Amino acid sequence: MDAPVLYAELHLANTQGLRCTSPPSPRQDACWGSGWHRVALKLGCVGLILLLMGLSVLVGFLVQKPPIEKCSVAVQENKTEPTVRSTILECPRDWHLHWNKCLFISQTSRPWAEGLADCSLRGATLLLIGDGKELKLLQDFSKGKGQQFFIGLKYVQEDKVWKWMNGSILNTNLLRITGKNEENSCALISHTEVFSDSCSSDNHWICQKTLKRV
């Protein structure tokens, strides 16, 4: 009877030893894992908030950018507007635009010297003809008016040549003067020709000046 009792006690002791060396409770691991989960969740929320704040700032910047660009365009337009306006050319009142010239047609008839003086008072000179096309247009104009006009061309007896008021000598390939080449001869333009007449005779005249910049 003694042997079985000893066996039972030893078995119990071994069983208790096994219980003492059992692994940690699964509940403790779960608590540990849930703690890290909460920390990660908080960090994720903070990161999401920062991301949303960054996006809001970016959207605000993009929304504000177009007005700035519009303002800059408006400023550039304002800067260029004076430049555009400064290139606009026009003739004074009672003057007529003719290519790149402004022409004034006298309403009275006077000698050539008085016509020259009148043009000078207007800041102009008697008409100078530059080429054949301009000559043709002026002859057509003279025909429409039914008049003849003094121009800025006079015979210089000392040099035996016709000279324009700017000092240049007449190019006979451009136009030919009909009539006498003598002292006190001035040129007139009609609808058919350019001819000489006495500078003392009374005729209408044409003044010219460059276009005015406004």
From Swiss-Prot:
Disulfide bonds join 119-207, 186-199. Keywords: Disulfide bond, Lectin, Membrane, Signal-anchor, Transmembrane, Transmembrane helix. GO terms for biological process: NK T cell activation; regulation of natural killer cell mediated cytotoxicity. Its main location: membrane. InterPro entries: C-type_lectin-like, C-type_lectin-like/link_sf, CTDL_fold, KLR_subfamily_B, NKR-like_CTLD. One of its GO terms (molecular function) is signaling receptor activity. Residues 1-42 are cytoplasmic. SMART domains: CLECT (SM00034). The keyword Hydrolase does not apply. One of its GO terms (cellular component) is cell surface. Residues 64-214 are extracellular. It holds the Pfam family Lectin_C. The chain crosses the membrane at residues 43-63. Residues 98-208 form the C-type lectin domain. This is Killer cell lectin-like receptor subfamily B member 1. It comes from Rattus norvegicus (Rat).
